[in-house]
Amino acid sequence: MKYQFSIIVDPATYDNEGLSNGIDLRKNNFTHLEDRGAIRAQQDWATHIAPIKQFKGTLGHDYSFMTVCVPECIPIRLEIISYANEFAFMYDDDTELDTENNTSAENDKLMGTFLAGTQGWSPPQDQSSSGKTRILKQLFSEMMEIDKECAIATMKAWAEFLRVGSSRQHGTVFTRLKDYLPYRIKDVGEMFWFGVVTFGMALHIPDHEMDACHKLMEPAWIAVGLANDVFSWPKERDASQRLGRTHVVNAVWVVMQEHGFSQEQARQYCRELAAQFVAQYLDNIRNIKNEESISPDLRTYVEAMQYSISGNVIWSKFCPRYNPEKRFNQTQLDWMQNGLPSTVELDGASNTSSSFLSTSTHGSPASGSQTTIESKDGWTADSSGIVSLLLNCSLPPLSHKVISAPLTYVDSLPSKGTRDMFLDALNHWLHVDEQRASQVKMAIRMLHNASLMLDDVQDGSRLRRSKPSAHRVFGVAQTTNSAAFLVNESIKLIRELAGDQGVAAVLEKLTSLFVGQAQDLHSSRNLSPPSLTEYIQTIDQKTSALFELASRLMCLCSTATVVPNSSLSRFCILLGRFFQIRDDYQNLTSPEYTKQKGFCDDLDSGTYTLPLVYAISQQSENFLLQNLLSTRLAEGTLDDDQKRLALDQMQLVKTNEFLRKILDSLYDELRAELQCISSSFASENPQMELMLMMLKL
């Protein structure tokens, strides 16, 4: 991991009380940007929600929260994540003295505001919630302007935090630490902080690595939660007393009940336990430092999070929030009392300086790493060794390293994660246990990756998610063989997961996939455009089929008492159609798609997408367009000038406008179908709402 924006603080200047041994304290060089973001959030809260009384948030005289907890935050992003974090602290204080039911209702309302705000509509809410809506819209707008992809991932993480954490169980009386700690990981803000750090450092953690991320980070979050409980104990104890509660949702209180300790004994016990989890976490960092099977961004995230541990400890010791005798520094006081300056420079550089707009802060494996080559036993001058080997019928099977290499490559490429998000949203209704849900995700990902590899070979695609397609790295034969192996492995996994019914489902959908692909290839090879009906049938047998299979497998594993299979099937079919037509449209119009797959990649492959099918149907005697397709078939590709000419011909009949209308209609129908399914389950599904919002153009 590279260190560009922070310095190490002299350890002689602070005492970490044994809570972050082995971890440096680092401090961001642009702390004034945190001051600006936090104070701006306070002012907006006071303007749009309610006056602030005796609030002490994230700022500190020498150590403000974000400055030491995310020391490698890219400066251009520091102000906005500090704004978000200060809002979270104010929201937490605002709900701290409320009942559990009211807090949960407020969380649901805020999640609804979050979803509604990003879609441009506002449900009727009270004055206070409307103010929060306004603040969130401003927050998301600024984040999207900086980095849309990271911002959407962060919103998803924050929505998950509101769903599972954010004081939802503050009415629960925990009396055993082993019951309390899993809750504390969620409530301390694991997913909120994940969103903050990944946005602040421009990190992109693939969805398929989230389980690994949770496991690697678990000891860190326990350590942070315990340390936070040690320092916040007086504040939270007093708040519970004011509310008339007989318990405190804090590890110190839990340890007092479980072991009969005094307050100070319980705090010391928590300190010692936190130190043990810090040691476990540092082991995790060392173990994955050069582990290339883990994405560089996940390795960076895991390494960077150690500074959240040390930063949280030192901030907690010196912040006015937990230490009433501490004061803010003069700049902070001036800005709080007299208002913020109109702009803040990044130490002499404009805050739009390109030097701060980097989108990656990866480290790289140590240059001195070595590769171990296995010796080839048996090859000796003495033939007896060879004969002995030939007569040994118990040799172990070959390693899967070679056959898995193309699969590992494709799986490592950045992904929108739509299918994983779809499965998570389905599980909101279906209640599949975590292990089986993860297996369904794995099986669907395996089939999806296999289809990508085969499609790229058959379509001649040069790029996949902005990287060379697998067959251009490993060759057509190896890629095809690996894809077939992946299909085989997915069937084995599904058999273990869902038995004969699962195997029947996957074989049915594999048949659909192959038949749909055959229709696609036939049309391209023979310059035979499909009818609109044939085009939709092809989508249903390819894109929709995988969504249907995912839904069917989840239903087979579900513990829900009522499952509206026909409605789910219709939703999956419509979702597949929307997803594919959106992809067709984006392939011809989106700069991001050009970066990922090349300029108008579908025209290179000769695929009859909906834009092409529509344009041909509307101008059957457009010989120019027909001859461009013939040239593509003869030469195997079109150059950019030829593609631009084809686009011009399609726009003669306003193809793009037609597609937008189709997509809008499909989107409206998807939302209506979602409401019907939600009614059948008697449960709204914010995650599915969020997924649709993210797909909307």
From Swiss-Prot:
Residues 351-376 are annotated as: Disordered. Residues 1-330 are annotated as: Fusicocca-2,10(14)-diene synthase. Residues 351-364 have a biased composition (Low complexity). Substrate binds at D92, N228. Mg(2+) 4 binds at D455, D459. Mg(2+) 2 binds at D92. One of its GO terms (biological process) is alcohol biosynthetic process. It comes from the Eukaryota. Pathway: Mycotoxin biosynthesis. Residues 331-697 are annotated as: Geranylgeranyl diphosphate synthase. Transmembrane segments: none annotated. It catalyses: geranylgeranyl diphosphate = fusicocca-2,10(14)-diene + diphosphate; isopentenyl diphosphate + (2E,6E)-farnesyl diphosphate = (2E,6E,10E)-geranylgeranyl diphosphate + diphosphate. GO terms for molecular function: geranylgeranyl diphosphate synthase activity; lyase activity; metal ion binding. Keywords: Isoprene biosynthesis, Lyase, Magnesium, Metal-binding, Multifunctional enzyme, Transferase. In the N-terminal section; belongs to the terpene synthase family. In the C-terminal section; belongs to the FPP/GGPP synthase family. Multifunctional diterpene synthase; part of the gene cluster that mediates the biosynthesis of the diterpene glucoside brassicicene C. In the first step of the brassicicene C biosynthesis, the bifunctional diterpene synthase bsc8 that possesses both prenyl transferase and terpene cyclase activity, converts isopentenyl diphosphate and dimethylallyl diphosphate into geranylgeranyl diphosphate (GGDP) that is further converted into fusicocca-2,10(14)-diene, the first precursor for brassicicene C. This is Fusicoccadiene synthase. It comes from Alternaria brassicicola (Dark leaf spot agent).
